[in-house]
């Protein structure tokens, strides 16, 4: 995958729950390290926007939807495993 591709994430969280805070911190750190200047993160709180969560079929939090590049993917959990994230995004884990 080209190193210039823009990644767009929509992260669904449940208020200020610990696992929600961890997911946001982990996704932000991952993007800073592996996708500098090539990412956008939209955060949606399911308590504040439940209809939006239902429209996107979000039934567990935290869940991140990778909107771009295609295909659309979902990753559930705190996003703490860097290798899993790299592979899910189609990035080479051996490229710094």
Question: Which stretches of residues belong to each language-model region?
Answer:
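A structural boundary/capping signal
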Residues: 2-3, 7, 40, 45, ...
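Thioredoxin-like thiol-disulfide oxidoreductase module
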Residues: 44-60, 89-93
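Solvent-exposed alpha-helical segments within well-ordered globular domains of core cellular machineries
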Residues: 22-25, 29, 51, 83, ...
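A short, hydrophobic beta-strand/beta-hairpin element that forms part of a small beta-sheet core
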Residues: 62-73
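Domain-scale activation on soluble regions of proteins
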Residues: 7, 33-37, 41, 52, ...
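Local sequence-structure signature of Cys/Sec-based thiol-disulfide redox active-site neighborhoods
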Residues: 2-33
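Ser/Thr/Gly-rich flexible loops in soluble cytosolic domains mediating phosphotransfer, phosphorylation
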Residues: 79-96
